[in-house]
Amino acid sequence: MISPTVIRWLPLGAVLLHLFEEFVWPGGFAEWYRWYRPERAASVTTRFLVWINALFVLMALIPVALGFRQRWTTASTRSEPPGTPYGAAFWLVVASIAAANGLFHVWAVLRTRRYSPGVVTGCIVYLPLAVFGFIYFWRTGLANLPTLLQAALIGPAYNVYAARNHRRRAKSLA
């Protein structure tokens, strides 16, 4: 079994791998997205991409900082750091947003029949991470059904919000 300490870091590792694929190797996400959605191209600035991805990296650090507990506790041993019930919830939200992003990349590839920077890590990292996390937190009792359902809905809801926001920003910048 994977240690909870390692599990806390998995979303951050996944996000960093995905960003590496999108922007370093092979890179080209910004150009690809502007080609894929020309009506939103004005909204996809370097400043926006840095800001939104920095925010996602920070979100992935929240479970690391909070830890996992069913209730607020204090450390009972040196090997068991204090945690909160919110660590698992944030972990699941990050995984849900990541999985929705992975599905966005898959949809774009199927629609265009062209490589989308981020589709590989979206498929082999983001989607399995979300499946693993939802099963793990349910089986360990670290997340209850309402928490799981809310997290599962936040990911797709964020993608819908982001698409609408890109449209709005592009119109105001045009």
Question: Model-flagged regions — what are they?
Answer:
Residues 2-22:
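N-terminal signal-anchor transmembrane alpha helix
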Residues 16-23, 98-109, 156-169:
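Transmembrane alpha-helical segments that form the membrane-embedded catalytic/substrate-channel core
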Residues 22-43, 165-174:
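Cytosolic, membrane-interface loops and tails of multi-pass inner-membrane proteins
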Residues 48-68, 100-101, 125-130:
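Core segments of transmembrane alpha-helices
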Residues 72-73, 82, 106-116, 137-142:
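Membrane-interface helix caps and helix-loop-helix hairpins in membrane proteins
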Residues 93-105, 116-137:
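Hydrophobic alpha-helical membrane segments
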Residues 111-124, 143-150:
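Non-cytosolic membrane-interface motifs at loop->transmembrane helix junctions
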Residues 130-174:
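Terminal transmembrane helical module of multi-pass membrane proteins
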